[in-house]
A protein has these predicted regions:
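N-terminal glycine-/lysine-enriched basic segments
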Residues: 1-186
Length: 187
């Protein structure tokens, strides 16, 4: 059994988290790159940060750090239906910033957590100021970006979002055949 203590343990744990964050960052946004991951003889090529985060595995103690971030992103996904990549990227950035301020005498994870939480109202205010009511044109642009320019897919997504309304949920799954089907359920 390998035991690490102090800054060495913190750096090792954080490195797994930040490595996962950097990998997911390469897939992020409309210009995100494709990443290939080989696992058990099968290769996954994806621009989906969430799929990548759940498939990639690290060695040694870095694995533990990555699994902690992966778990946090899964909780966000369950609560909101999205946000896994953003959760991983923000967590990685916060951890790197916290590690820059590490000192064995002053290191206090609870104080760091409180400090981060103290910024939440300001961040929420900024996000509220930046938010806008989505019109059909904005939905089309977002859907087209998310579908990597596939107009057919983006049109179906926009139609589904408009159909379920602001508080509805759209679930997209890979089908058995070729083509796109839309199934609407009430309740």
């Amino acid at each position: 059994m390998k035991v690490l203590e102090g800054k060495r343990a913190l750096v090792t744990l954080t490195r797994g988290m930040t490595e996962l964050s950097r990998l997911v960052a390469t897939t992020y946004g409309p210009n995100g790159s494709k990443v290939a991951v080989s696992k058990n003889g099968r290769v996954l090529v994806t621009t989906d940060g969430s799929a990548l985060a759940h498939e990639v595995r690290f060695r040694d103690l870095h694995r533990l750090g990555a699994s902690l971030v992966r778990g946090a992103s899964t909780k966000v996904d369950r609560a909101s239906g999205d946000g896994t990549s953003t959760t991983i990227l923000l967590t990685g950035a916060l951890l790197e910033a916290a590690l820059d301020h590490y000192s064995p005498r002053t290191w206090n994870p609870v104080a760091i957590a409180r400090d981060i939480q103290s910024y939440l109202p300001a961040v929420e205010g900024l996000l509220t100021d930046m938010s806008c009511s989505p019109d059909e044109s904005l939905l089309e642009r977002v859907a087209e970006m998310a579908s990597h320019g596939d107009k057919v897919v983006s049109e179906h997504v926009v139609n589904a979002v408009i159909r379920v309304g602001e508080n509805g949920t759209v679930l997209i799954r890979a089908g058995d055949g070729v083509g796109i089907e839309m199934d609407h359920r009430e309740g």
